[in-house]
């Protein structure tokens, strides 16, 4: 048995023809394993059924194009009667290329063979939805030597091998833990970090019990970070707003700096301390220390593109700030001194 590493040099790799990453939903759901996690009973199954219908019929998802294809939906917490009732609520013309199963084997206990057989018999299938992940895992097993992380990673990797082998997207529906991490929502996924680590894309659906609004967070290897604001209306999750990483970053920029730009609109130059700046701008909520921090972190990103040059210099016990507004050809003159 040849146990050597199979390597490829960078030059050869760059010249190798490769197809682009396949997306079932453009820019959102890509080939590979996708895990969507949310609290129980918040509408994940309604979302999955609607998504399956949209893809099977080739309809857009929140304004994004879809790759029309056959869809397999393992709705393992439902009965055929419940699925039928939901279909009646969502569509008048159910497609014949959306397939359902309410029972299946477990990972490592027949599931992989069942999915593989179906994909072989239905080669037009490009999306498989498994609702839920817990229903296809062996709950009687122990962590053993691999530990929880190892078991979680192995289970997702087993599903990923099918996705990669058949070049399809598999969407796993999962739960969030009850105790949540306010700093990183992706740490709220039930189980170990092996689940999000093995997945190609992770989705977090967060909804307040008392309302119909929710936020869908997206992070993946082939998709950029996104935050989608959704509204649950007439049993369908509708898009209210979509923000990508650039939009989110811009929203986090201090509004104070944009007020500095307005302040300099009728001035060509201003020199003074942070305290003097706040006094002239009539700022009540920003402190001198915050001014120093904002200018140090974001002046180049906010002020410079808008024609305001910023410099600072310590003189004795004070630190002077200097703004110079550049117009037209002056923008090419970088000379500014205090």
Give the location of each predicted region:
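Pre-Walker A (Motif I) flank of P-loop NTPase domains
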Residues: 30-34, 69
């Amino acid at each position: 048995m040849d146990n050597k590493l199979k390597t490829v040099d960078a030059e050869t790799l760059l010249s190798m023809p490769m197809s682009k990453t396949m997306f079932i939903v453009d820019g959102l759901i890509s080939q590979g394993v996708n895990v969507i996690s949310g609290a129980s009973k918040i509408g994940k199954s309604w979302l999955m059924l609607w998504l399956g219908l949209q893809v099977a019929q080739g309809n857009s998802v929140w304004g994004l194009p879809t790759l029309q294809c056959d869809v397999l939906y393992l709705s393992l917490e439902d009965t055929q009667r419940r699925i039928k009732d939901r279909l009646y609520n969502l569509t008048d013309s159910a497609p014949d290329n959306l397939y359902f199963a309410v029972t299946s084997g477990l990972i490592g206990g027949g599931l992989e063979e069942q999915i593989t057989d179906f994909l072989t018999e239905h080669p037009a299938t490009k999306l498989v939805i498994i609702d839920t992940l817990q229903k296809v895992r062996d709950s009687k097993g122990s962590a053993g030597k691999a530990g929880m992380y190892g078991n979680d990673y192995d289970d997702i990797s087993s599903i990923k091998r099918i996705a990669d082998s058949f070049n399809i997207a598999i969407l796993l529906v999962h739960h969030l833990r009850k105790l949540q991490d306010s700093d990183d929502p992706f740490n709220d996924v039930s189980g170990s970090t092996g689940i999000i680590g093995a997945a190609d894309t992770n989705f977090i659906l967060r909804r307040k019990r008392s309302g119909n609004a929710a936020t869908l967070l997206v992070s993946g290897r082939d998709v950029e970070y996104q935050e989608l604001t959704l509204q649950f209306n007439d049993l369908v999750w509708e898009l209210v707003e979509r923000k990508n990483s650039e939009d989110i970053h811009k929203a986090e920029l201090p509004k104070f700096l944009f007020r500095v730009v307005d302040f300099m609109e009728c001035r060509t130059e201003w020199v003074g301390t942070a305290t003097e700046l706040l006094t002239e701008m009539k700022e009540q909520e920003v402190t001198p220390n915050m001014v120093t921090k904002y200018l140090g972190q974001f002046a180049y990103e906010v002020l410079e593109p808008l024609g305001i040059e910023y410099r600072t210099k310590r003189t004795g016990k004070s630190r002077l700030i200097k703004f110079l507004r550049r117009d037209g050809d002056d923008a090419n003159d970088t000379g500014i001194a205090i």
